[in-house]
């Protein structure tokens, strides 16, 4: 993705089957990638990847510095269990959604942001915030990510 070209040392979590969404399988791949990196990581995730990242985060919380969660999918739409997803994340996070996302209502994205203890930003009519909705390069998203990193660094200073 464009984000990968803008952020050095970025690694994409490859899924065995991008067309088959299985939360436990996808979360396992996120955990494997975090383990392979070795250092603490920042997460940028989109759609179902947000759910996988949040699920993985609870088992690797000490290894995650923060997360930008863009257009999170609604787990109910995929028949996924939500019990684990209903806890606050122990690191800074921002959920970005759209008022006309076909995969999740803005109210559901805001609900999940609240459950996760994430800041929430609705960027208006932006669809699923992907290439299909007219987003290729997304400088505003990169700026949001860099601000999240900066605010996190300020918050952890003594």
Protein language model annotation of sequence segments:
Residues 75-76, 99-104:
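Acidic catalytic loop of the alpha/beta-hydrolase fold
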């Amino acid at each position: 993705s464009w984000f990968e070209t803008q952020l050095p040392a970025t690694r994409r979590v490859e899924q065995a089957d991008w067309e088959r969404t299985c939360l436990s399988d996808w979360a396992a791949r996120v955990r494997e990638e975090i383990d392979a990196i070795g250092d603490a990581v920042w997460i940028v995730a989109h759609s179902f990847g947000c759910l996988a990242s949040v699920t993985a985060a609870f088992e690797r919380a000490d290894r995650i510095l923060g997360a930008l969660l863009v257009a999170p999918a609604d787990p109910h739409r995929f028949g996924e269990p939500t019990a684990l997803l209903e806890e606050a994340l122990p690191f800074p996070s921002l959920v970005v959604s759209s008022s006309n996302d076909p995969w999740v209502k803005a109210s559901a994205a805001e609900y999940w942001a609240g459950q996760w203890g994430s800041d929430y930003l609705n960027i208006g009519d932006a669809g699923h915030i992907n290439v299909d909705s007219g987003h290729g390069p997304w400088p505003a998203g990169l700026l949001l990510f860099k601000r999240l990193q900066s605010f996190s660094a300020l918050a952890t200073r003594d």
